[in-house]
Design a protein with these regions (language model features):
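Structural beta-strand/beta-sheet cores of well-ordered domains, especially the beta-sheet scaffolds
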Residues: 6-8, 29, 46-49, 62-64, ...
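Glycine-rich phosphate/diphosphate-binding loop of Rossmann-like nucleotide-binding domains
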Residues: 1-56
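Electropositive phosphate-/nucleotide-binding environments in soluble metabolic enzymes
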Residues: 13, 17, 38, 42, ...
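Short, glycine/charged-enriched secondary-structure capping and boundary segments
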Residues: 3, 25-27, 48, 65-68, ...
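ADP-ribose/adenylate-binding Rossmann-like module
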Residues: 51-110
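Adenosine-phosphate binding glycine-rich loop
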Residues: 85, 90-179
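Hydrophobic/aromatic beta-strand patches that form the interior of the parallel beta-sheet core
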Residues: 11, 34, 79-81, 112
Length: 179
């Protein structure tokens, strides 16, 4: 949304056609939606000034979809911003950085890969998190945890521990060294 507001040409990639249609409708054609596959990603890398990585695959290691070769094809001094670096990288040249040393150059491309980027904006992030969580808190308060889990699949998918047990497959697998 911010890039569109600044007049940038924005390309959004996804494998879910329904999600792409929804985005296209929501932004009234002001962005370009494309199916995420190697050919499209290679093509866009050659002219992108800013590449934003934001892939999260719950329960799985994030696949590398932007190879070092694709990064090499980018114009020098382009920028990679990786929003979900704390979930392993979808860009081969990415590695976590810190708020005190947030950027590095690799293949002539400036990388910004700070985990928990919202930590810089603590108050704003807190308000956003409160707003996102409030409907779940109200549901649990109204019907109790067990009934809320039964009636709300997204709440159930977000549950990591329950009654002293690890119930989320991704957390369990990562703690057991399978991820």
């Amino acid at each position: 949304r911010n890039f569109i507001g600044m007049g940038a040409a924005v390309y959004v990639f996804d494998q879910n056609l329904s999600r792409l249609r929804t985005l296209d409708h929501h932004f009234q054609g002001k962005l370009v939606t494309m199916v995420s596959h190697e050919f499209n990603l290679e093509k866009v890398c050659t002219f992108a000034d800013v590449l934003v990585g934001a892939i999260l695959v719950p329960g799985q290691r994030t696949p590398v979809v932007i190879s070092r070769e694709m990064v090499k094809s980018m114009r020098k001094r382009s920028i990679i911003i990786y929003l979900s670096i704390d979930h392993v990288g979808c860009i081969e040249t990415s590695r976590p950085t810190t708020h005190s040393n947030p950027t590095y150059l690799e293949e002539g491309i400036l990388h910004y890969c700070v985990p928990n980027m919202t930590g810089v904006l603590g108050r704003t992030a807190t308000h956003a998190m409160n707003n996102a969580c409030w409907p779940y808190v109200r549901l649990i308060a109204a019907v109790g945890l067990e009934k809320a889990l039964e009636t709300n699949p997204s709440l159930e998918r977000g549950l990591y521990t329950h009654q002293g047990e690890i119930v989320h497959p991704y957390l369990r697998d990562s703690l057991e060294g399978r991820i």
